[in-house]
Amino acid sequence: MSIAKGKNALLVASSYYGPFYPDGKNTGVHFSELLIPYNVFKKAGFNVQFVSENGSYKFDDHSIEESKLGDFERKVFNDKNDDFWTNLNNMKKASDIVGKDYQLLFVAGGHAAMFDLPKATNLQAVAREVFTNGGVLSAVCHGPVLLANVKNPQSVEGKTVVYHKHVTAFNKAGEEKMGVMDELKKRGMKSLNEIFAEAGATFIDPPNPNVNFTQIDGKIVTGVNPQSAKSTAEAAVSAL
C-alpha cells in the first residue's frame, strides 16, 4: 500500500513568465522542479493538485532546453498523454484552494518565483492554512521565497513560519555563478540569503550551488536547486 494513500499534496508554480536572463530568454516555473516532485508524490500515493496564484503558468525557457532535460524529463516533456500533463492542465488558482484539505505543499522554483511569490497573498494564505493544520511546507531552488513571506498564525509578533528554522535555497553564490545577481539587483530584488535572514531564518549554504542539498527542520523542508528536487520531495514525504 502506498504510504500516502488518501493524502493530498499541493504543487505550487509561479504565474510569472517574462524577461530576466541576460541572453534575452524568459523565466517561468522550472520544468523539472514541477515534474520530479510530482512523480515522487504520485509514487507515494498522494492525490496531487497543481496551483498558482492566478491559475496560469509557463515554463522557464532554459529549463526546457534539450540540453537541460534528463532522459525521464525528456520522455515526459515529449509525451503529452502522460498524466503529468493532464494534472498540470487542471491547475487551479490559489483562491479556489482550501488549505486544510491538503497535508503537504511543495513550491517549485525558477527565477520567476522571485517576481510573484513574495506578493502572492492567496498562495501565502493557503500555505499558512496547511501549516496551521500540521502539514508540511516544502520548496526547492527559488520556491522557498514563498515560505519566507508566510506569517506563522501562532506568532503574536507576526513572525514567519521559517523564523528560527534552518533553511536552504538557491543562494547568492549560485546567482553569481549563473551571472544573474545583477539582474536581480536592477529589479530591486535581494538574494535568498538576505531574504531569509530578514525572515528570521538560519540560512544554510550548500558546499556548492550545484550539488544535491536539502534541509529538514520539523515541517519545513527546503532544497537548493533542480538537482535537489527529488531529495527535497522525498524528505517532505518523510517529514509528514
Swiss-Prot record:
Coiled-coil positions: none
GO biological process, any: methylglyoxal catabolic process to D-lactate via S-lactoyl-glutathione
Compartments where located: Cytoplasm; Nucleus
Domain of life of the source: Eukaryota
Catalytic activity as recorded in UniProt: methylglyoxal + H2O = (R)-lactate + H(+)
EC number(s) on file: 4.2.1.130
Active-site residues (renumbered): 141-142, 175
GO cellular component: cytoplasm; cytosol; nucleus
Main localization of the protein described in the UniProt heading: cytoplasm
Protein task: Catalyzes the conversion of methylglyoxal (MG) to D-lactate in a single glutathione (GSH)-independent step. May play a role in detoxifying endogenously produced glyoxals. Involved in protection against reactive oxygen species (ROS).
Protein's name in the database: Glutathione-independent glyoxalase hsp3102
Organism: Schizosaccharomyces pombe (strain 972 / ATCC 24843)
Gene this chain is encoded by: hsp3102
